[in-house]
Structure formats: C-alpha cells, structure tokens
Amino acid sequence: YSSENNFYTAVKNEYPEFLEKNKIESSLNLFYVAAYLFGNDYRFSRPHIASQAFPDMELTNINIARFFVADRPELYYWELAQISQKAGWTNGTFTIILNAVEEDYIKVDLNRYIHKSLFSVAPDAIDSIRHQLEKLVGDSGYYGIFAIFNYDGFPLIDYEWNEHLLQSIIENYDLGFKLLEPTVKDRRYKKGIIVPQSNPCQSFEEFVIAQMKIDGITSIAKDAFSGYLRRKGLVLTATIPIELYDGDGLRLEGNNFVFG
C-alpha cells in the first residue's frame, strides 16, 4: 500500500529527471500517469495505491481505515496520527479517515476510542441519561453540550463523563435527542446543540433562524448578533460560526445578518 503523497516523494527522490522531463509537478499528476501505465498491476483509487497482494477490498477510506486499525479493541488519537504520518495522508484525508474510524468506534474522550462491540451502557443508566437531558433541555427546548460543566447529575458508568462521551452516547443510543452542530468542527471542542429528536430543524443554521423568528428578529448587526448567540446559549465564544455568514437562509449583508 502507498498513498499518492508517499509515492510522489519516493519518485521525486529516486527519479527526479522523470518528473522534470514529463513536467509532473504534483502527486495528483503522477497518480494519474501511474494509473495509466500500471493499471493492470496495481489498484488506484485516490489517494490510495495498492498492489495485487493487498487484501481484496474496494479502496475506500473506511476500508483503508479498517485495514490499518485492524479492529483493535481500543484506539488513541496519537496512534491514528502516527498511522497517517507514516501513510503520507494529507490533513484532509486524515480527517476523512478519522471520521470513517468513528463509524466503528465510540469516542469516550478527546483522545480515546473504544470499539463499538465492546462498549455498552446499562438500560437503567440510559434511562437516567435521558432523564438528565430532559431536565437540561427543559422549557427552552435545547441546551448547548458545551455548557455542561458539571456531570454530577449523570449516572455512574464505566467511563468518566465529558462532552465527547455524551455526544457519542446521544448519537449511538435511542435517547430521543439529537445534536445540531456548526458545519466547521474542531475535534478538541464540542459545539453542538442538544434538541429533542422531534425538533424539525436539520442543521445548526436552521435552528438559529428558528430562534430568531421566535424573537421577532429579521435583521441584526454583526456585533449584536455575536452577543445574541451567546445570550441564547447557542455558542460558547464570541466567534460566529462560519456557515451563518452565507448560508441557505441566513447571510451577512453589509454589517447586518438577515434571513429570508
């Protein structure tokens, strides 16, 4: 197996004259040249290259991820980062691979993953978690996962409570709740809004617009909007999520955010 980046680096080190003669200046160019020349001997699916001896699988990101982690019972972020560096994946490919890994694993904290087949929460604990979420969401109909600083009300389980574990449980168990997250994510912090599963909003932007409609707001100055989002408990910091600047329904016109 090789990524296109590692392949390009190897060719650049061993056969620089070949790249220069054929005016190949990027891993992308070389990938397609190699696919044309060696398509019968190797398998190519950007950014992955595999020999015929590589396990017989479609070269998708999820399959490549599963090959490298090999169903380990427990994974750490640093291990995945190490695999990525050795494989020569770009940051973008690593992010895609990381998301693929999370289809098979439960993220229990910032750096640790447990295979789904080995992770469980007792039914009575699930009921207790559901009850606690109902209390948090309360009359407002939502609660920012980033605003939970104390987990004393949550049941004692085999893992230490944190926002990553809570999000994993919400996403993998039938609690009657879902998370609406800003499009641009940061793996270090959770920015989602917990809402009942029955809430009609399908995106963070839709939910923000719904709150503005409730408050009778159709236009609001940029500086005031930042404060509004924080007062409503929709964000933790003063930074306005990027998708609100030019979304499907909400956008920045001049110095004002408007929708409709």
Model-predicted segments: where are they?
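C-terminal non-catalytic scaffold/interaction domains in large multidomain proteins
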Residues: 1-260
